[in-house]
């Protein structure tokens, strides 16, 4: 009897590369750490840890916001040598998306956010959601909103006024100069009053809101050829769908930096609408101060 020797083939796994091992080690470490945390802490404790994490994240965002403001105040020449251009670039990128819809996108997002707010609040009162977790989520959302507001647009409040960016000579004017300026603008108003279209009752006939909203950016297109402060290619101004609410507070327009939308209340004096459109478009040009936006609207 001859013993038959059967070869045994042992399949070995190919050796892992050093780079792959280095990648997998931290992944396995954090996975194991999370598993161990789940073993040591109950579900309630996990929610508490998440709430603490949100509070810490909120604190970090608020500290970063404070640092941005402090640095802008301490070194305005450095910050505002690049921030206005950066702000306009970010707003242009956002506007390239929000301009795809004819309505004010921020109003839709506000309604959805309000619905989500009350939905989660109801879950708190019904015991399906922890109050601490809900409050930490609200805090994180508000902190993120403040951080983004300052980073995208709001930091301009601490920058130089528009007269400096345009290189204008600002000085105290005499009484005679003010009288001369008043007479000049009165003559200009009378001259153009004869050129505007009027109806049978001799009242001015204004173009439709949609027509004015498309014409308003043209003023800044002309200014962009003369001043670096301004850019062309601005989208049309949008009407406010919730104009009744804004009419209650006397608000004629609003600019939302999160969606880069310049919006105007159509329920206002018709003669004010063109100026208000140019005012809100000035905010779209990273002009934050209200007086500066008024002056830019006058130029446009």
Walk through the language-model features, giving the residues of each.
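Membrane-interface segments at or immediately adjacent to transmembrane helices
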Residues: 156-223
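Auxiliary, metal-adjacent structural segments of Zn-dependent hydrolase domains
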Residues: 200-266, 270
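Positively charged N-terminal leader segments that act as targeting/secretion signals
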Residues: 4, 13-32
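Transmembrane alpha-helices and immediately adjacent membrane-cytoplasm interface residues
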Residues: 118-119, 132-163
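Membrane-interfacial entry segments at the cytosolic side of transmembrane helices
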Residues: 50-55, 128-139
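Short, positively charged and aromatic/hydrophobic N-terminal segments
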Residues: 2-10, 32-36, 40, 44-46
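Active-site recognition of the HExxH zinc-binding catalytic motif
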Residues: 102, 275-287, 294, 298
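Membrane-embedded alpha-helical segments of integral membrane proteins
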Residues: 62-123
């Amino acid at each position: 009897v001859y013993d038959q020797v059967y070869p045994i083939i042992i399949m070995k796994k190919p050796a892992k590369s050093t780079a792959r091992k280095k990648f997998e080690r931290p992944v396995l470490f954090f996975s194991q750490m999370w598993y161990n945390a789940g073993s040591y802490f109950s579900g309630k404790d996990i929610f508490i840890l998440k709430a603490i994490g949100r509070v810490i994240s909120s604190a970090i965002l608020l500290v970063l916001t404070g640092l941005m403001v402090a640095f802008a105040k301490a070194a305005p020449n450095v910050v505002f040598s690049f921030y206005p251009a950066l702000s306009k670039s970010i707003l242009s990128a956002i506007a390239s998306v929000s301009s795809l819809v004819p309505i004010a996108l921020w109003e839709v997002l506000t309604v959805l956010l309000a619905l989500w707010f009350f939905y989660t609040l109801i879950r708190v009162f019904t015991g399906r959601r922890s109050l601490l977790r809900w409050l930490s989520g609200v805090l994180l959302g508000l902190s993120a909103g403040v951080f983004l507001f300052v980073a995208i647009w709001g930091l301009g409040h601490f920058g130089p006024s528009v007269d400096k960016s345009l290189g204008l000579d600002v000085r105290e004017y005499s009484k005679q100069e003010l009288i001369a300026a008043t007479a000049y603008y009165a003559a200009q108003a009378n001259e153009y009053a004869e050129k505007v279209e009027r109806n049978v009752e001799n009242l001015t006939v204004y173009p439709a809101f949609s027509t004015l909203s498309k014409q308003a950016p043209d003023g800044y297109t002309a200014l962009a050829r003369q001043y670096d402060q301004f850019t062309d290619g601005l989208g049309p101004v949008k009407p406010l769908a919730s104009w009744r609410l804004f009419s209650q507070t006397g608000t004629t327009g609003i600019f939302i930096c999160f969606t880069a939308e310049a919006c105007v209340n159509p329920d206002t004096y018709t003669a004010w609408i063109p100026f208000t459109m140019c005012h809100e478009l000035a905010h779209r040009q990273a002009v934050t101060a209200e007086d500066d936006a008024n002056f830019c609207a006058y130029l446009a």
